[in-house]
Every structure is written in C-alpha cells, then in structure tokens.
C-alpha cells in the first residue's frame, strides 16, 4: 500500500487441535497477494475432521474485496470464527458491507477455539 509501512505478508496455519484449524494472517491482502490465504482456506474447508476454522486477523494491515470474498466463502460453510480484535480498516470493510453482523467474532484465538 502506497504511503504505509510495509509489513511482510504471511499466512501461517497452526496445527489442528480438537477439530479446529487456525489460520494466522499478517500484512496486506489484495487481489495480487491473496494466493497463500486462498490456499490455506481451501485446504481447511476440504480437510476431513476440521469442524471450525479460526481466522486470526489481528495483524492484517489492509484488506480489499478479495479478502472479503474469501471471508464470505468460508463463512458460508458455517465453520468460520474470526479472531480479533479486528483491525480498523478491515472492520470498516466488514461494517460497510454488513458482513460483521453475521460473522462470528471472538476476542483472540483461544476464545475463538472455544466457541
């Protein structure tokens, strides 16, 4: 993003625990950089035994409609919980599109695992 501090984008998948897969997102996510997140989300949706997908977005600096689409795709499986606190820019996008109203969100990864 022009004019903002660059944070290296990273998508980490934590080991599954009790049927919960945690995907940790760091950095900026747009159409050109969404590939690793798309792969991690697809693998989580397709994995046998994964009953909940926790998306940790606490370190997301920027997200565009591409990431929003990914969130909605997982949300439709009925297994998504977003771990926050949700960063301001992503929160704005979720509010603008009214996705936040239907998106289960927890304060941190451990709280999301427990839902």
Regions found by a protein language model. Name each.
Residues 2-42, 59:
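STAS-typified acidic loop motif
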Residues 28, 86, 109-111:
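Short, solvent-exposed coil/turn elements at secondary-structure transition points
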Residues 31-103:
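Amphipathic alpha-helical interaction surfaces in cytosolic regulatory modules
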């Amino acid at each position: 993003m022009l004019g903002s501090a660059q944070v290296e984008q990273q998508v980490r998948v934590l080991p599954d625990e009790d049927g919960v897969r945690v995907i940790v997102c760091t950095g900026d996510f747009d159409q050109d950089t969404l590939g690793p997140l798309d792969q991690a989300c697809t693998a989580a949706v397709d994995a046998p035994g994964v009953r909940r997908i926790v998306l940790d977005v606490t370190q997301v600096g920027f997200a565009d409609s591409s990431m929003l689409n990914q969130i909605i795709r997982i949300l439709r499986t009925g297994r998504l919980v977003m771990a926050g606190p949700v960063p301001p820019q992503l929160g704005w996008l979720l509010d603008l599109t009214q996705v936040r109203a239907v998106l289960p969100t927890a304060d941190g990864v451990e709280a999301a695992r427990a839902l």
